[in-house]
């Protein structure tokens, strides 16, 4: 029993403005929709159900019914979901605008209550005030919201969400913004609305209001790779595939600085209808390059590493070793379809092997060495502390020699041409015979930064940008990269 969905269904019939604003996919005829994947609350109709991916941001936040309208909370078009979405910092004035919008769209007065009661009492059995028949009148005005942190912005999607105790498999978390407003003023608003209801319904209204306005906020969740769908990718088998984003826009572009003012547009119904009549869609192809996806890929690589290779004498590169149970890697994993990761893995392992051979560590690929446990961490460049510790443990394992207070290790074993070029590029055009700790870190990080320079990467994919940001980046041709041409970040 989704209260917000029911309220939109019944209040949609009040006037022309409501019929436009409160139109939900969940209340319309069902159309074929994508398969659902996660359990959570649909941001569009606020019901707890199975969710599918959004075509505007790739996050799972829309039910299979509402997905037919392709609405995203990051849209420019001021539909109901967008008007309920606020960005930090939320002021008391912003909340006043939200409450005014609620009062305009979902009014409760004596005349309206009698109208709804008369429409329900069609048969003798409906003389009782059963909650399921009057659910649309039992939606209190609260400051309950779902929140998510994207890049440097915190978004709050206000609404009336039932079943807060249910399992939440999405990155959105419940937050109570009552502290940003006056508690007594909000109580007064709801008591006034409640006074027009029959006594039996007043009790249920009060119970719902206090349960949704006095709860404790939950801690924010961290985004993970699984929170984003692969369905927006042009080619799911290509690691450098672009993601197709669809955004709903209007002819009068609204500045992001005025983000929280969208809910005030319905004050002038004629102007709002005119704005909505100018709506259209914009399509963008954006790169999937970001720290979140990169961290996920390197996490898989670190679990597939065969550290025994650093003591081997194989002539082939690390990924091309065959018929050796200690060094042969399973290269059938999808992650190895990414040529960048193949290059990084081969180069890092080749360089480490050169260090081992140069410093007299005579071993064989079948030997068991204590340094092996640190090799996988050398690919976790996004986890700075863990990566630094791994490089330091590797360097100390090589038994460096102290020269004038600085420790050095040798580098006089043959490396492949690609590694040689990277070393020269980062060591003033030379291949040094000795390296200190900083040199070793510089070379190892350069091998990864050559393709994945995480120092200058976004935390989340560009699908989480606002429509104005996408429009600006598109004008600068900064939505895509050149990886399909095998050009690295450095090139």
Curated annotation (Swiss-Prot):
Residues 1-81 are annotated as: RNA-binding. This is Non-structural protein 1. Signal peptide: none annotated. GO terms for biological process: symbiont-mediated suppression of host cytoplasmic pattern recognition receptor signaling pathway via inhibition of IRF3 activity; symbiont-mediated suppression of host cytoplasmic pattern recognition receptor signaling pathway via inhibition of IRF7 activity. Its main location: host cell. Pfam families: Rota_NS53 (PF00981). It is found in: Host cytoplasm, Host cytoskeleton. The integrity of the zinc-binding domain in NSP1 is important for degradation of host IRF3. The pLxIS motif targets host IRF3 for degradation; however phosphorylation of NSP1 pLxIS motif is not required for its activity. GO terms for cellular component: host cell cytoplasm; host cytoskeleton. Coiled coil: none annotated. A motif (pLxIS motif) lies at residues 485-488. It comes from Rotavirus A (strain RVA/Cow/France/RF/1975/G6P6[1]).
């Amino acid at each position: 029993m989704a209260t917000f969905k029911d309220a939109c269904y019944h209040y949609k019939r009040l006037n022309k403005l409501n019929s436009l604003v409160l139109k939900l996919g969940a209340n319309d005829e069902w159309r074929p929709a994508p398969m659902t994947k996660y359990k959570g609350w649909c941001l569009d109709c606020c019901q707890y159900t199975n969710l599918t991916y959004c075509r505007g941001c790739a996050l799972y936040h829309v039910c299979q019914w509402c997905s037919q309208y392709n609405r995203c909370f990051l849209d420019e078009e001021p539909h109901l979901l967008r008007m309920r979405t606020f960005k930090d910092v939320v002021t008391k004035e912003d909340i006043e605008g939200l409450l005014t919008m609620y009062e305009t769209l979902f009014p409760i007065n004596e005349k309206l209550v009698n109208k709804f009661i008369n429409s329900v009492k069609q048969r003798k059995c409906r003389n009782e005030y059963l909650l399921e028949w009057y659910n649309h009148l039992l939606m209190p005005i609260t400051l309950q919201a779902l929140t998510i942190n994207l890049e440097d912005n915190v978004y709050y999607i206000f609404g009336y969400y039932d079943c807060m105790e249910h399992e939440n498999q999405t990155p959105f978390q419940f937050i109570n913004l009552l502290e940003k407003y006056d508690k007594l003023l909000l109580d007064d608003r709801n008591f006034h609305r409640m006074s027009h209801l029959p006594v039996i319904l007043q009790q249920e209204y009060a119970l719902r209001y206090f349960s949704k306005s006095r709860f404790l906020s939950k801690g924010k969740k961290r985004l993970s790779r699984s929170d984003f769908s692969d369905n927006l990718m042009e080619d799911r088998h290509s690691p450098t595939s672009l993601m197709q984003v669809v955004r709903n826009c209007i002819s009068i572009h609204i500045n992001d600085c005025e983000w929280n003012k969208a809910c005030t547009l319905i004050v002038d119904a004629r102007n709002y209808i005119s704005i909505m009549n100018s709506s259209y869609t914009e399509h963008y192809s954006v790169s999937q390059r970001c720290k979140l996806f990169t961290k996920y890929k390197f996490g898989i690589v670190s679990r597939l590493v065969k550290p025994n290779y650093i003591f081997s004498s194989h002539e082939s590169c690390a990924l091309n070793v065959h018929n050796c149970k200690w060094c042969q890697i399973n290269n059938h994993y999808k992650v190895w379809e990414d040529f960048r990761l193949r290059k990084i893995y081969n180069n890092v392992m080749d360089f480490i092997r050169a260090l081992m051979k140069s410093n007299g560590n005579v071993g064989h690929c079948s030997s068991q060495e204590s340094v092996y446990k640190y090799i996988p961490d050398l690919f976790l460049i996004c986890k700075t502390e863990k990566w630094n510790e791994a490089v330091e443990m590797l360097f100390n394992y090589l038994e460096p020699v102290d020269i004038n207070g600085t420790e050095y290790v040798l580098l006089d074993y043959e490396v492949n041409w690609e590694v040689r070029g990277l070393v020269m590029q980062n060591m003033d055009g030379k291949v040094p015979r000795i390296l200190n700790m900083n040199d070793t870190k510089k070379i190892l990080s350069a091998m990864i930064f050559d393709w994945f320079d995480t120092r200058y990467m976004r935390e989340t994919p560009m699908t989480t940008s606002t429509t104005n940001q996408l429009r600006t980046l598109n004008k600068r041709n900064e939505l895509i990269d050149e990886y399909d041409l095998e050009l690295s970040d450095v090139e």
